Amino acid sequence: MSFIQEFKEFAMRGNVIDLAVGVIIGGAFGKIVDSLVKDVVMPIVGRLVGGVDFRHLYVNLGSQQYETLEAAEKAGAPLVKYGAFINTTIDFLIIALAIFVAIKAINKLKRSEPPAPAPEPAPEPEDIKLLREIRDALKQR
């Protein structure tokens, strides 16, 4: 079998396609959650803690002071952008919560399905029956 043929068989298997769809949907979901955090959640949290915009919180590790984060970045100053880290952490927590809720719902659906009935045992083959009869006859002698 050629390399290309093997790759086609691998790529067209159901679980590989499912994985690809999951990655694409996950990427889109990540963008939605990122927007939710940056544009909805963090402005509300910032307002509740005194009008702070978390995106602009940073520590300047250099000796020169700058008015804004953008000015410090433009000058190439060494920075610790802990506001961006807070945003990313909240972003992660929301994604983790959404995945947890989705998996919990899927598991609940799986539990509510009745278990599949156990298959009936296959009838014993004739040669096995004959061998048992011979064994039993030999035991009685």
Swiss-Prot record:
GO terms for cellular component: plasma membrane. Keywords: Cell inner membrane, Cell membrane, Ion channel, Ion transport, Membrane, Transmembrane, Transmembrane helix, Transport. It is a multi-pass membrane protein. Its main location: membrane. The chain crosses the membrane at residues 16-36, 83-103. The keyword Transport applies. It comes from the Bacteria. GO terms for molecular function: mechanosensitive monoatomic ion channel activity. It is found in: Cell inner membrane. The keyword Cell inner membrane applies. Homopentamer. Belongs to the MscL family. PANTHER family: LARGE-CONDUCTANCE MECHANOSENSITIVE CHANNEL (PTHR30266:SF2), MECHANOSENSITIVE CHANNEL MSCL (PTHR30266). Channel that opens in response to stretch forces in the membrane lipid bilayer. May participate in the regulation of osmotic pressure changes within the cell. This is Large-conductance mechanosensitive channel. It comes from Azoarcus sp. (strain BH72).
